[in-house]
């Protein structure tokens, strides 16, 4: 029945109550099983941006790109990634930011963020998540298994690249943002995690079931409750949990009261509503004395455009609803510099 419903949901057959991104609905459903269309071609994203592609070629020419692969501890999948060493020599060269991409992307999709950190002297570690890019195929679990994969990456890289990993920061976009927040459940369980000084969560969800429900509501031909029931059964079979309501990054924030988090979100996000970022931020600061975390939303920015739009002549607003006087890249680097040396 599930497969039949997926076939019925083609763009030619649905009727919409309001404007909605069809691909985002298909994405949520298809990620509950392995789907080959979510294996993008490696590096194709860089070709769209000549400046970044040129910088990548510069890194390649100077041997600043070190490939690696690891086996996941929970199911022995192979994940592929790189250590990108900053060509700028300064006091940040022994510090590294780990970047996590979003659903249907590869690590190359977030090269703009890597570019920002590399130009400031920080190294970057990035990798393709399970079921994405070069990494092995396996159902996407929206942060459940991906958070353990992140722990595996941290342990491998700290052991292998000791000189570059005296201090770490985590950046996650969308699915990656959920992963870095849900990784909080592992923070206190491994001594090596004390090297992680901050988290940046960019346009992720606070509760997956609610985000999914918001998308399903726009289907006029199917009751939302029916689709949620089917999703719950599929999630239980795939993830081993009782439905999508179990995937709630917000419930993990209390586990890291002393970890500063920078929450970013575009106010024009049609995939995940920007109110999720405010909800996550408000929950996080409940446990902070003094307050360490920050929230910035970007007017006119859609999903994944925080840095693209936030560095142009568009308004960036902080948690007090005051207009920020700097672009999102400079604001992010200030946050990184403030906390990575603590």
Regions found by a protein language model. Give the residues of each.
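C-terminal catalytic histidine-bearing segment of alpha/beta-hydrolase fold enzymes
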Residues: 278, 282, 286-342
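Conserved alpha/beta-hydrolase
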Residues: 114-136
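An N-terminal hydrophobic leader/cap segment in hydrolases
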Residues: 1-72, 82
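Hydrolase active-site cap/lid region
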Residues: 185-245
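Catalytic nucleophile-loop/oxyanion-hole region of alpha/beta-hydrolase
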Residues: 106, 132-166
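Short beta-strand/loop motif that positions the catalytic acidic residue
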Residues: 256-257, 263-265, 269
């Amino acid at each position: 029945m599930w497969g039949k419903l997926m076939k019925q949901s083609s763009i030619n057959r649905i009727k919409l109550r309001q404007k909605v991104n069809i691909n985002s609905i298909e994405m949520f459903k298809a990620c509950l099983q392995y789907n080959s269309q979510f294996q993008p071609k490696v590096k194709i994203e860089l070709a769209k941006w000549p400046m970044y592609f040129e910088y990548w070629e510069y890194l390649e020419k100077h041997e600043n790109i070190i490939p690696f692969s690891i086996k996941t501890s929970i199911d022995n999948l192979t994940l592929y990634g790189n250590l990108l060493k900053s060509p700028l020599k300064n006091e940040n060269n022994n510090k590294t930011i780990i970047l996590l991409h979003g659903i249907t992307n590869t690590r190359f999709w977030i090269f703009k963020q890597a570019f920002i950190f590399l130009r400031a002297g920080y190294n970057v570690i990035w990798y393709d998540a399970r079921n994405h890019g070069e990494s092995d195929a396996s159902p996407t679990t929206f942060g459940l298994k991906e958070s353990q994969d992140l722990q595996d990456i941290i342990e491998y890289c700290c052991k292998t690249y000791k000189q570059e990993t005296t201090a770490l920061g985590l950046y996650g976009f969308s699915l990656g943002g959920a992963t870095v927040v849900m990784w909080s459940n592992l923070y206190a369980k491994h001594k090596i995690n004390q090297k992680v000084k901050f988290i940046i969560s960019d346009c992720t969800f606070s509760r997956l079931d609610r985000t999914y429900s918001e998308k399903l509501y726009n289907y006029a031909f199917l009751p939302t409750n029916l689709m949620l029931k089917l999703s719950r059964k599929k999630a239980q079979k795939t993830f081993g949990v009782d439905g999508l309501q179990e995937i709630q990054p917000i419930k993990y924030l209390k586990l890291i009261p002393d970890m500063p988090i920078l929450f970013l979100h575009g106010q024009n996000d049609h995939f995940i509503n920007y109110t999720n970022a405010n909800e996550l931020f408000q929950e996080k600061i409940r446990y902070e004395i003094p307050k360490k975390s920050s929230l910035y939303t970007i007017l006119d920015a859609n999903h994944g455009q925080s840095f693209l739009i936030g560095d142009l002549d568009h308004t960036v607003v902080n948690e007090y609803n005051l207009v920020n006087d700097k672009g999102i890249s400079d604001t992010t680097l200030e946050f990184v510099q403030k906390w990575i040396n603590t």
